[in-house]
Amino acid sequence: MREKYLDVLKKHNIKYFYHFTSINNLDSILENGICNRLYMDKTGIKYNYTDKNRFDNQMGCISFSLDYANKSMLLYKQKRSSNDWVIIQLDAEKILTNFYDKIYYCKYNASSPTVIKILNNNKNYLKTIQAFNNMFDESGKLNFQAEMMLEGNVSCEYVQKIYVDSLQTKFIVQQLIEDNNYKNIEVIIKKEMF
């Protein structure tokens, strides 16, 4: 079954998943991985909300964008916060290889009325290969709000790069990476992603 999910990645040439967060959460992420809110609350991990309301009500999940970061959602979050933000790039193939059956594949933003209705009435459908295929339209394009929600947590072994929007933020992130003994995570200034 796993191979079918990996085939969808290959068919659409998806190599990366993206997760954006406040830079204030990065030290915790480098120490604990990208963790869901339920786990962080239970274990006492400190974090800054990136989605205080969480209208999809999936507290046990973490969210990823496919192929590119959800720029409109990031801009929305940036306007409501004075924090600097980072975009974490993860290896899509490795994530799907290990978590394909723990992911909800949402054609639209998970807090949209369409997805919330499915989450309330037929949640398991969103874990199917059909739901993953349905994220793409007939021409192979994703809705700009499409997202995946992974039940559980993801360690930093899947992190490849961290994108920032300034040299100052790059220095801060590089220091955090060094403090947490990671040598294989690259930090890149890429303003157009923000």
PLM features: residue spans?
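Active-site-proximal loop/hinge segments that shape catalytic or ion-binding/gating pockets
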Residues: 1-63, 70-194
